[in-house]
Amino acid sequence: MRISLGYPAWDAEEAMLRQRNVSTPLATCVDETNLRGMQRHIEKMHVNDSVIRYILKLVNASREPGAYPNPLSPRASRALLQGAKAWAFMFDRDYVTPDDVQAVFEAITAHRLNGTSQSSLDGASLSKRLFDSVDPLAA
């Protein structure tokens, strides 16, 4: 998965540089036990066959001869499923919808379709083209 957080504002980056050797301890937001529990919950999450078919249609559309420079691999399929499950979990659901797949689609596929982590712009447009070519209701 690739996401961009952007760059800090001038003042924030300047403050960061001025604090050279000052380390700020991070507060724990989740302990290991809770994290493992969340992971187990996500693994057990229900995924309807129509969502699986939707992911397969998206991935297979990328594999049409000449359609995309770097078709999506089975690893991308798994990443889409895991990403969609995690997205659903963040919204306190124990099931996955096509909307969850759509929410994580570009972040998971753009760099894969483009074949490089350097320029995600082309990858993002490739992701959008692929995403727009598959109807989630037809899955």
Task: List the predicted regions and their residue ranges.
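Conserved AAA+ ATPase core "coupling" helix
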Residues: 1-57
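Preference for short coil/turn "hinge" residues that link or interrupt alpha-helices
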Residues: 23, 28, 38-40, 63-65, ...
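Amphipathic, well-packed alpha-helical segments that form the structural scaffold of globular domains
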Residues: 56-60, 106
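C-terminal engagement/docking regions of AAA+ P-loop ATPases
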Residues: 64-139
